[in-house]
Amino acid sequence: MSHYDVLVEGAGPAGATAAYYLAKQGKKVALVDRAKFPREKACGGGLCVHIEEFDHIISNWDDFLESKCLRGIVYGPEFTPVDYVSEKPFFYNIRRLKFDNTLVEYAVAEGATLIEGIAVKSFEVNEDNVVTKLRNGDELTSDVIIGAGGSFDMVSRRIREIENMPMKWRDEDIATALYFEVEVGREYMDR
């Protein structure tokens, strides 16, 4: 059974970033995700300008940056448009396929161990450590577990149980996302 200082469940931006900084500090980190990277993600393709504070990310962002948003149109209650134009970006458009994979690669380069394509089945917090069982039957131990796999990862589920919070989404809280990529000519993007 392998032991880690920290096990991070979920290798999306939050999990990969946590793994990166922990590994950079010399911690032995397991980064576990049910998906294999690179993988598509249908949400979160916009980064706020605060991403500029992370030098290790923006120094290589040509790998994942698609475009900068310098203009936006917002419509009011009477459908009156308000046009915002700026020389500085409002936000950056990225491809999650490339961005998430880049963050995972940064974490691995700092020494994190990536365990991909296997979901966390359960975990048990003991006096001495955390025992995490993976869906393939493997068991890992760690001093700490971080839940970064979304609102229903195993850590979030445990917190919901402890705090007596609902375990299922209500029908009115559920939405469907459709991801479709359309080729748009440069002449339309620069308007």
Which residues fall in each region the model found?
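Beta1/beta-strand and adjacent pyrophosphate-binding region of the FAD-binding site
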Residues: 1-14
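Conserved Rossmann-like nucleotide-cofactor binding loop
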Residues: 14, 37, 152
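A conserved beta-strand/loop capping segment in the N-terminal third of enzymes
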Residues: 46-102
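Predominantly flavin-linked oxidoreductase catalytic cores and closely associated redox partners
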Residues: 106-191
